[in-house]
Amino acid sequence: MSTEDEKLLKEAKKLPWEDRLGHKNWKVRNEANVDLASVFDSITDPKDPRLRDFGHLFRKTVADSNAPVQEKALDALIAFLRAADSDAGRYAKEVCDAIALKCLTGRKNTVDKAQAAFLLWVELEAVDVFLDTMEKAIKNKVAKAVVPAVDVMFQALSEFGSKVIPPKRILKMLPELFDHQDQNVRASAKGVTLELCRWIGKDPVKSILFEKMRDTMKKELEAELANVTAGAKPTRKIRSEQDKEPEAEASSDVVGDGPSEEAVADAPQEIDEYDLMDPVDILTPLEKSGFWDGVKATKWSERKEAVAELTKLASTKKIAPGDFSEICRTLKKLITDVNLAVAVEAIQAIGNLACGLRTHFSASSRFMLPVLLEKLKEKKQSVTDPLTQTLQTMYKAGCLNLVDVIEDVKTAVKNKVPLVRSSTLTWLTFCLETSNKALILKAHKEYVPLCMECLNDGTPDVRDAAFSALAAIAKSVGMRPLERSLEKLDDVRKKKLSEMIAGSGGGDQAGTSSVTVQSSVGSTATGNSDASFVRKSAASMLSGKRPAPSAQASKKVGTGKPGGGKKDGSVRNEGSKSVEPPEDVEPAEMGLEEIENRLGSLVKPETVSQLKSSVWKERLEATLALKEEIEGLQELDKSVEILVRLLCAVPGWNEKNVQVQQQVIEIITYISSTAAKFPKKCVVLCITGTSERVADIKTRASAMKCLTAFCEAVGPGFVFERLFKIMKEHKNPKVLSEGLLWMVSAVDDFGVSLLKLKDLIDFCKDVGLQSSTAATRNATIKLLGALHKFVGPDIKGFLNDVKPALLSALDTEYEKNPFEGTAAPKRVVKTSVSTSTSSGGLDSLPREDISTKITPNLLKGFESPDWKMRLESIEAVNKILEEANKRIQPTGTGELFGGLRGRLLDSNKNLVMQTLTTIGGVAAAMGPAVEKASKGILSDVLKCLGDNKKHMRECTLAALDLWLGAVHLDKMIPYIIIALTDGKMGAEGRKDLFDWLTKQLTGLSDFVDAIHLLKPASTAMTDKSADVRKAAEGCISEILRVSGQEMIEKNLKDIQGPALALVLEKVRPGFVQEPFESSKAMAGPVSKGVTKISKSTSNGTLKQGNRSRAVPTKGSSQITSVHDIAIQSQALLNTKDSNKEDRERVVVRRIKFEELRPEQIQDLENDMMKFFREDLQKRLLSPDFKKQVDGLEILQKALPSVSKEIIEVLDVLLRWFVLQFCKSNTTCLLKVLEFLPELFNTLRDEEYCMTEAEAAIFLPCLAEKLGHNIEKVREKMRELMKQIIQAYSVGKTYPYILEGLRSKNNRTRIECTDLIGYLLETCGTEIGGLLKYLNIVASLTAERDGELRKAALNTMATGYQILGADIWKYVGKLTDAQKSMIDDRFKWKAKDMEKRREGKPGEARAALRRSVRDSGPEVAEQSGDISQTVPGPLFPRQSYGISEQMLERTPVPRTIAGVNGPTDWNEALDIIMFGSPEQSVEGMKVVCHELAQASNDPEESAIDELVKDADGLVSCLANKVAKTFDVSLMGASSRSCKYVLNTLMQTFQNKKLAHAVKEGTLESLITELLLWLLDERVPRMEDGSQLLKALNVLMLKILDNADRTSSFVVLISLLRPLDPSRWPSPATAEVYAVRNQKFSDLVVKCLIKLTKLLQSTIYEVDLDRLLQSIHVYLQDLGMEEIRRRAGADDKPLRMVKTVLHELVKLRGAAIKGHLSLVPIDMRPQPIILAYIDLNLETLAAARMLTATGPVGQTHWTDSTANNPSPPANSADVQLKQELGAIFKKIGDKQTSTIGLYDLYHITKSYPKVDIFSQLQNASEAFRTYIRDGLAQVEKNAAAGRTPSSLPLSTPPPSSLALPSPDIPSLSSLDVKPLMNPRSDLYTDDIRASNMNPGVMTGTLDAIRERMKNMQLASSEPVSKPLMPTNDNLSMNQQSVPPSQMGQETVHTHPVVLPMDEKALSGLQARMERLKGGSLEHM
């Protein structure tokens, strides 16, 4: 390494960690990560505060672009995760996402370490985050990244097991991996599938996954499954379980034949397939199946079929919950149906429902149980078998429990039918056998007497069933519950019952034992075989891919590091931690001879022989000798077991001599207390004999001492557990009573942390308190009293069901042993058991799972509109807590917390208080788990402190107390910090919260996390409320006390203001900070206590400063201190950490000025301290005005060199100027006014314009202070305001000046009035909105102050000079005196103008208007009025978006772009695309000007040049629409919105430009415009109604001028539901549905407009493309959806049908020639073909077109395939038919133009066809008309004109009656209109079809009707707005009759062409002839 690198690394070590880790040099970053890893390796305490400081850094470090650095970062992360605990989970999401994104595609080492890190996150219980990340990772497009992700999931599942990694999440991810294109990914997916089979079994995996696989993959997996053995065991545990391991080992030793608890714990977790399935909704298909009609049918077969359908649907494995109450009522009736087949089907349906719904079917099961039990009377096996099966299913599925069915069983066993009684008892036996012990213990008191009574039944079957039930109870809970009842039985029955119990118990026990042994051996073998391999890859599960041997596992990345002081002494191997085999506690048999052989020379042979002696004295001597020998042994540990075995054999525990017994016990006590390790085997060998010796008063003391020694050796948990069984079964009651008394002393010595409290309490309750011996009961009471001392009152909840007398005795004992909490034990355990404390103690008290009690009805009650129902739900939760003894598990409480969270926002305050109490109760009952289970509800609880009611706040604090009792304060700190900084919380709430915190901190001696409270507490020191400040001060004192000085000094940078002085005084006594003077001076009377501190310290500071100051130079006003000189080298302004946008976001944009509040002053100080150099900020914040002037001079001198920095902190500087304006010191104010013009000149030179936020900070104050009482100050302020007007914008400045007119200061009003006159004089009246405020100025003429009246009259005179007499429109209502006064002033002004030869008032403005009207904008521009008086930023606001006409005639002049704006088209486009909103406006001005110029070019060459940029321009502007509207919604001006819309309008006014816009761009633009039309926030914006109008007009212009094909295609595509992300603002699903409905309605309106004009524009449309888009839309919907929507009257579908209908109507059969883009050969046929056929048929029937073939039998495929006739004949026929249809069109005046165009296209397509040969029977006039028409069409086609503008004459009337003989007459067809005759769309045609055949359309009535329609059409406006443009955005849709068969109503008249004079005059002439009686022949 070079010297430079070494130097760099050395220097870098001094930097903070964040700077090192983010350093630009990779070597620095690399070394930083290595150092960080070593720091974590040195941490042994998971609560070390350093871990919290570093956690957030890894998000960036693991994403490092340098591979070696990234690898080291992963090493550091692994070290961090090993050192941390589950608290590190807060960083899991962001770090895991970064690893998945950046590390999984790297080098092998990097991938391995990334996987190791993921597994450590799992170990820290961040499983959900891990799986969320994996869900994203497997969607990566790069297969190389997917394989490691799948592999790490595989490793996690393989190592931690399915208990930690939920299989359901993985099962959901696998299906998409099965079809992955990469084979490695597929192989990994298979491997994970096989691993799942090891954990949850093959059947669940098969049933869930196999149906989603391809057949080949199924076969492969089937073959692999043969090699997979179920019963996997985890090889690694999560961190919290690792802590419990020693205790788990200690408690794993049991006596007897049953399986050990450890074996149970490590056994493979039984996964219920039900939990892995997704629920299926069966209610919806059931409704559609006709079930309800079927079950009411009279025929039994129909009823059976209906129920069978339900049975079939309910056979799914998991049914979605719903309302099954009506179904169950129906089934209950059907159970008793007269037809047994129906009844059996109903019973089977109930069974299926119970199996699929489980606990959700509980209420329904209880409802139907009595009927089902009654049905047991049926003797037919076809009924009894399904009935028995259903009853058993209901119980197994958890729908019923023993407690619920007591009453129903009692009723059934008293039934008069013996079969019902016996079957009920048989079912009860089944229930008892499948229930757990706890449930039977609850219910046995009810069932035992019931069964005993049934033993006397007269029917043998009933008696046998009762015996079976009693045997089941005894088998489960033992004989104790039956003892008293057995006394009443005779010997025969007693003997029979005993035999049954013995028979069932013995057999079962043996079976269980053997099974357990086999499974244990099998699983051990499996575990051993698997343990020898480390499977890092999921693909290694597949055959032929054997994993690497475990020897390599030790080398893998992330192996555990030794940590002596951490947790249990070591950290397991991270990769594949091996589980140590449990200690063998059961001693093997060993004879005396073998013992002697093993003893060897350890004990003298004579001693052993004496121990065997029958003489007690010899035995005594031998024991004494043995004791001496043992005491002399050097290595006792190796011989412990053999010595204990010797003593147990000789003299043995049957020794009768007391002295010998005592010696034996003392020797064993000595061995157990002296040996380093005393095996549990030895305890098992001795404990029975020792417990018996406790019962003897002579040996009691030594035996108890021995038991205590055992506890010290192996832990009290193991000793207690062994004693329970011995004491319970021993015949000597003294063993029990004295053993209990020893337990009392043991609890006192060792505490309860190492005991299993649940087992101990159960033993006391079931054995001790139930004993008939008083001594035993008393000893038990003492033991429970001792437990109370450690556990507290919670123990009472577990003893509620004991007898009242015992309860009172217990209460007395509790009083003697009051709760003291956890204390240090008097004795300690030698083994590692002592380190595990988390598994015992209070937390061992049993917690109840309440998830089943949180029913949907309970949760629904929380949301009930009835407050009583909501209260009932809250009280129900309290009741559940009581029933659970206030000890609950977190399982399934997520929805409960959600319901309670909603009630915290209840309008009923009493309910909120009840909820707070309940939440506190839930927290106390749940314990530490509440922190994770509550889903952040604590933040909502804290919000309740913002209530103004004291009682509410007290309830909140009580809830916080209970919460604190459950979790530690450090878990609550993040929520408390948010609450303290919440602006909505009132002063009382903050004060109460600070007091509460102070109280909690007072009880702590050391609490590092309190440092996080320092910042919010210091902020509160500047609060307006004195109570809050006082409470915050008290809290800060406690924070400082518990945090420690080192931690405080690290965090001093976060503290400013008064709190800083307080902190420094406590941390560094005597320290004083100078800037605090300014705080005192500016904050004023904020805090009296703080002010005193500043006074007492400021004197000392000044004296000390005087000594160190240099002698001031004569004549110099600047005094430079030594400290200032020392920091001169630093930058004057530090803008490194400045974020101007964030500061401006919180600026309140007010026009009216308000004095600064103390907290605003404090914020200003804080910002100045951050950004200004120390000497500068000290001067500017000093209370001494001279220092402030000095500071300004420093800034003034540096101004040219720090202009960029000044701009960055301009808002801070302006706030300081505002502060100075509010002070009374004139010297400082004059200096400020001297500095400000220079500042604004600098800003102008930098081409910087103030932002709106900066203007809102400064201008209100400047406008208000214009009326200063010193003339000199007023003058400077006046000039400053004029300078700002020029630099900023008149349009944005004059609102502040207008606000000044409302000031209470008359001088301010005078100045503002003069400024308005100045604005009128210099800027004219073109300032948008200024004229409408002249009435305010005019009203000032009535004021008393003469100066104010004079100023108002002068301003009015200026306005009169410009406007002339028009000014009277703007003056508002005035008194006669005011009018007279103003009029006199106007006359004087007119005379004055005459003298000066300035013309007459208003003359110049009128001339300008005329010139603009006559010559366009150029003349106005040349006149100089606009260009001179309106600089760039002064563009009038109201010139946008008012109406289409206004937009068209307001082109933007070129010079309006301003001096610094863009100068050409390309530059303007760049600025629009990349500039800020303000800069974009300048670009748009140029674009508008260029467009206006190009539009006026007669040769259109300029437009042709711009066409190439049209699409790019519109695309850019479409993006700008959203941005500008978003900015305006945040409070900014709507100026940029208007410019965007105006530019778009100018673009789309030109057809060439509009046609150049591409389809994609058009879609984006239309979508954006329609969305903003619908946005309810737009009307609330500035000029919102104008913007709505502009949006409407622009939308209509787009529809008019854009490419028709693109418009149609885009709008049809927009009929689909819109993606929620496209909407401008987020909302709920319901709101999105409503929005989509409104959006589609608008799209439909647009399509209606286009469809109206289709007749005249059809040749502009690419019909092939349009039909393709309709085809795609219909195919996407599908026939099922179309049918559903047709029934629901869906508007989008109706609209598409309408467009298709219009196309078919206009083109007839020729429409089939436009299907080139539709795949007509596909199967099934495209839906569009059926609709075209239907329209052709219907329109032909309605005489709206000529049928061209057999309707409904059109062949869409190749005609040769289906038609044997030659193709030529077919083509001729088709051509003839088409010509016939065209001649019909030409014969009708309304469609003649279209017909001629069709005929023209035919002649071009078939030039050899003689069309006039078809017109032999037509009149010569008609043929001539056709010839002339074709010639005209050809001429128009050459000129590029469309049919809509074709000026053709009316066809000869006589021709209409002379169709070609080859063409069928129109009148010969039956009329069957498709739509309702009232439909506007088809009014004329249908009316014509209903007329008298003799008259037809030529009658007088028909012509009148047609004229009326034409006149209506001509009178309609050209464009109707799409949306109402006022604030009410509701759309007035016209209702459409349902008889219109799904077609959209289009209000158009297809037979009426655009109005022309010739057509109208021709009709009028015909009407005159009809009136004269000469009807034309039709």
UniProtKB/Swiss-Prot annotation:
Record key words, sorted: Cell cycle, Cell division, Cytoplasm, Cytoskeleton, Microtubule, Mitosis, Repeat
Cellular location(s): Cytoplasm, Cytoskeleton; Cytoplasm, Cytoskeleton, Phragmoplast; Cytoplasm, Cytoskeleton, Spindle
Keyword Cytoplasm carried by entry: yes
GO MF term (any one): microtubule plus-end binding
HEAT repeats: 48-86, 165-202, 322-359, 363-400, 442-479, 849-886, 890-928, 932-969, 1008-1045, 1230-1253, 1254-1286, 1287-1325, 1328-1365, 1535-1575
InterPro entries hit by this protein: ARM-like (IPR011989), ARM-type_fold (IPR016024), CLASP_N_dom (IPR024395), HEAT_type_2 (IPR021133), TOG (IPR034085), XMAP215 (IPR045110), XMAP215_CLASP_TOG (IPR048491)
Chief location of this protein within or outside the cell: cytoplasm
Effect annotated for changing E195K: In mor1-2; short and disordered microtubules at temperatures above 28 degrees Celsius
Compositional bias per record (Basic and acidic residues), positions renumbered to this chain: 238-247, 565-577, 1393-1403
GO cellular component term of the entry, any: preprophase band
SUPFAM superfamilies the UniProt entry points to: ARM repeat
GO BP term, example: microtubule cytoskeleton organization
Tissues where this protein is expressed: Expressed in roots, cotyledons, rosette leaves, stems, open flowers and green siliques.
Function per UniProt: Microtubule-binding protein that is essential for cortical microtubules organization and function. Essential for maintaining the interphase cortical array and for correct morphogenesis. Promotes rapid growth and shrinkage of microtubules and suppresses the pausing of interphase microtubules. Regulates the structure and function of microtubule arrays during mitosis and cytokinesis. Probably not required for cellulose microfibrils alignment in roots.
Family: Belongs to the TOG/XMAP215 family.
Protein name: Protein MOR1
Organism of derivation: Arabidopsis thaliana (Mouse-ear cress)
